């Protein structure tokens, strides 16, 4: 199967690479199947490309690359939803918003991380309650460098 992404062009989709989000992502419950694509070499960015809606993709990061102290404890229900028993086996990513392609103004949703079971290829976006994390945490500081540990 092939899809055409406005960002990536034509992509060959291998069924065994698709990550299924049984409940979709928040605000996108109709889209349940995605590919996780690595960004350009040397960048910390990943892309979650919808298989069902070709013009839909999300910029993602491993939050610990920017926020050393970022830690979450998914509930046992959240882990069960993606067939995991231990949270340390999960891949944790967060969604990045880049306003008007201005990377220096990018924000990251630390309050709503995505957890993925890489073996079962199942994912879920969770909401951390209670949490000091925000949905629009600056990715970079005022000097345009990584906002390391700035949570």
Swiss-Prot record:
Its main location: cytoplasm. The keyword Transferase does not apply. Disulfide bonds: none annotated. InterPro entries: Flagellar_assembly_factor_FliW, Flagellar_assmbl_FliW_dom_sf. Signal peptide: none annotated. Transmembrane segments: none annotated. GO terms for cellular component: cytoplasm. The keyword Signal does not apply. It comes from the Bacteria. It is found in: Cytoplasm. Pfam families: FliW (PF02623). GO terms for biological process: bacterial-type flagellum assembly; regulation of translation. Keywords: Bacterial flagellum biogenesis, Chaperone, Cytoplasm, Translation regulation. Interacts with translational regulator CsrA and flagellin(s). Belongs to the FliW family. Acts as an anti-CsrA protein, binds CsrA and prevents it from repressing translation of its target genes, one of which is flagellin. Binds to flagellin and participates in the assembly of the flagellum. This is Flagellar assembly factor FliW. It comes from Natranaerobius thermophilus (strain ATCC BAA-1301 / DSM 18059 / JW/NM-WN-LF). The gene is fliW.
